[in-house]
Amino acid sequence: MSNKKADSKPQAKYPVNLLDTPFPMRGDLPKREPQWVKEWEERGIYEKIRAASKGRPKFILHDGPPYANGDIHLGHAVNKILKDIVVKSRNMAGFDAPYVPGWDCHGMPIEIQIEKQFGKSLPAAEVMSKARAYATEQIEKQKVGFKRLGVLGDWANPYKTMNFVNEAEEIRALGKIIEKGYVYRGLKPVNWCFDCGSALAEAEVEYKDRTDPTIDVMFAFAEPEKTAQAFGLPALPRAEGGIVIWTTTPWTIPANQALNLHPEIVYALVDTERGLLIIAEERVAACMADFKLTGRVVATAPGVKLANLRFHHPLASAHPGYKRTAPVYLGDYVTTDTGTGVVHSSPAYGIEDFMSCKAHGMTDSDFINPVMGDGRYIESLPLFGGLSIWDANPKIVDALNVAGSLLRSEKYTHSYMHCWRHKTPIIYRATSQWFAGMDVTPRDDGRTLREAALEGVEATAFYPSWGKQRLFSMIANRPDWTLSRQRQWGVPMAFFVHKETGELHPRTLELLEEVAKRVEQSGIEAWQSLDPRELIGDDANMYEKNRDTLDVWFDSGTTHWHVLRGSHKDQLQFPADLYLEGSDQHRGWFHSSLLTASMIDGRAPYKGLLTHGFTVDGEGRKMSKSLGNGVDPHEVANRLGAEIIRLWIASTDYSGELAISEEILKRVTEGYRRIRNTLRFLLANLSDFDFAQHAVPVDEWLEIDRYAVAFSAQLQTELLGHYEKYEFHPVVAKLQTYCSEDLGGFYLDVLKDRLYTSAADSRARRSAQTALYHLTHGLLRVLAPFLSFTAEEAWKVFQPASDTVFTETYYAYPEVAGSAALIDKWALLRDVRGNVTKALEEARTANRIGSSLQAEVAVHASGARYDALTSLGDDLKFVLITSAATVVKVDDEAQESVDVAASKYQKCERCWHYREDVGAHADHPTLCGRCFSNLFENGEIRSAA
């Protein structure tokens, strides 16, 4: 009767230590994560982290501000989560690492939104108030999205470039660089967007393919005698002909003022059916084929001999307004890669053209600049007045043809500049702007801005390292920075300029401070409503308010001034330890911040720059609406959990492109489950363990427990090294291996027998639990920076009296004597175990055994392996998870092998081992002697496993 009862309900009669935990197997992340976000906010977890970190060394990751417009996208998620991992890992490494999020609030996109909603005729004051309200609304929307991703920070007190104090400090920063002499006003070709009606920064320009007419145009001889002399001829063989240029911008022809030749390139005078043509000698054959002409070279001369010759404008015969000549200027930038080796120069529409004409004595008033800010020619331009330049292109080609100047016209697809906001083509256009001079030597420093910035690049640590050369090249080759913009919603360049000379008021620095004080109280609206007489009295008769606003890259580029040392100086400090953004920011925020700090402080505003790549789909394609391959982080968070996004980001090498697809997310989810299952096992088997009451001293632990803790401590050292270098994907890879192989596939697998079958309060079981306690402490802390929701959920089960895992620092594992030798020894044992597992699998496949516990093995080993195996004594069988194990000594590695035999004994009902002593106690015929002792006597004695 009793036996039958025991058989039907063995757990009741012969219980094992199978424990449970409130930490569930299923994460149910989409449901639980929002609860954690709410709880973190309600309980002030970020503030608790700050309190716990107070007094530690500071680590400042300065947040590059996203633009306050639109929903967050996957790129935002990558950026914010990487920052969150850095900040959390630095806090846990023993630093005081605050995170102050920020937003970029001024500029064109918001102004466009206001125009769309309310029209273009709003008074400036209304534009301002509506823009502020719109930006505030967008910030709140984005803030919810970032919090949902598990990002902790000072969300209640972010910085905003539109906050009055920040606007005021930007004006003060402008004053600083004026005081040092960097700022000047000048006419220069700048990137100009017709839709924006404003200059653009380099970072606001993108390149896309565009098809334009490409034309070869002849400028007729104006000085035939001088031209003949230049070629060493007594006279030109015929009067017809001229010099030939090639261009992809016909719209610039009406503004032509010069021609450029390379001084050392040899030019040929070619006799053709269209007259004498001057072309670079090495381009003659290609050009004749393109023009469908036959030609004979009459004479040659280097470019230097042709300098200052003049040629008629190609539209001279079409309209008297073009009856002018263009001189030849020499330029090293002319090449013979394409075209004719001759460049036509419209100085108002090209930087090199402008510089060349300036160098040859042209003044600002000499430049022909017929294109207005909206992309149309001035009405007075002959033939094409009032036309859009793009509409004028074909008409100009036709006019050139009628004038007899056109040699060839074709369609040409090329990479061309576009506005990053409007996606429309832009041009270089000479306008009067305020610039920061790259090669200006300031009043208080012997280095130019370019030199100081390049030194700043050299002093900065780059992650990955290739970023250094990229930024260095950009700084080395960039033109002067166009600081001014022609918009309303922006920080004003609050100058008073002389109505006739354009000079700044002599009290400009003092006046800027007065304006800044007003802006600090009332915002940039204070400048809009300011009557000049309030500040400059009767000087208002001679001086007027400058209407330009600052480039928004100056807004964000001076956050090291108006945030780190301004609005949030109590939390932050200068320079920042790290700026972390996408790789496009080498020409954006990294770049503008470097220039402003180099001007203000003579150094970079950061010690390190971390760059991440862009997101692509599973096939490596960029995400776009047209491809329909975009991934919405909000949708993924609601379907799979933000934790899956966090794990995907942490496990991907962010230095390149970050690929995402359903298949990739599926793999990430599987990896997450393995980690979660490991945590569940640890927590369940610690649910009856009280460290204060049950902990076993280190020197009394079983050997495998000492090994597990020593191994985990060694791994943690590696992981912290990766964290310190911002290498997150090796952290994830090693932790996944640790959970699935080192713990799940080995240590926890071996431990199950001891945890489940040893006496509940035995030294052997408490030794295992003590080790698991330390492992859990260590594991949760190294997981917390990226698996934040899960680590917190597990932590609250593990340490319910503690506020949060995020106030902890990385775990100090107990010292294990002889840990290095122990790790080496168990590496050998695990290697042998792998061979035994393989032999057991082969025996199972051959139907010689069922489970591994049905087997008895004999391990033939030599040398160190033999010594390691025999040192375990009878505990070897627990490590191999067999019912019996013996070791046979052999001479060398070649003789090593594993013999597997099925046990001839009965299976214990409780521990499932096959043992000779099953049934040795008549009252318990299905129980082995080991289980009998563990249940009813003093329990078995183990030393190793």
From Swiss-Prot:
ATP binds at residue 625. L-isoleucyl-5'-AMP binds at residue 581. Binds 1 zinc ion per subunit. GO terms for cellular component: cytosol. GO terms for biological process: isoleucyl-tRNA aminoacylation. Keywords: Aminoacyl-tRNA synthetase, ATP-binding, Cytoplasm, Ligase, Metal-binding, Nucleotide-binding, Protein biosynthesis, Zinc. Its EC number is 6.1.1.5. It catalyses: tRNA(Ile) + L-isoleucine + ATP = L-isoleucyl-tRNA(Ile) + AMP + diphosphate. It is found in: Cytoplasm. CDD domains: Anticodon_Ia_Ile_BEm, IleRS_core. Its main location: cytoplasm. InterPro entries: aa-tRNA-synth_I_CS, aa-tRNA-synth_Ia, Anticodon_Ile_BEm, Ile-tRNA-ligase, Ile-tRNA-ligase_type1, Ile-tRNA_ligase, M/V/L/I-tRNA-synth_anticd-bd, Rossmann-like_a/b/a_fold. A motif ('HIGH' region) lies at residues 66-76. Belongs to the class-I aminoacyl-tRNA synthetase family. IleS type 1 subfamily. This is Isoleucine--tRNA ligase. It comes from Burkholderia ambifaria (strain MC40-6). The lineage of its organism: Bacteria, Pseudomonadati, Pseudomonadota, Betaproteobacteria, Burkholderiales. The gene is ileS.
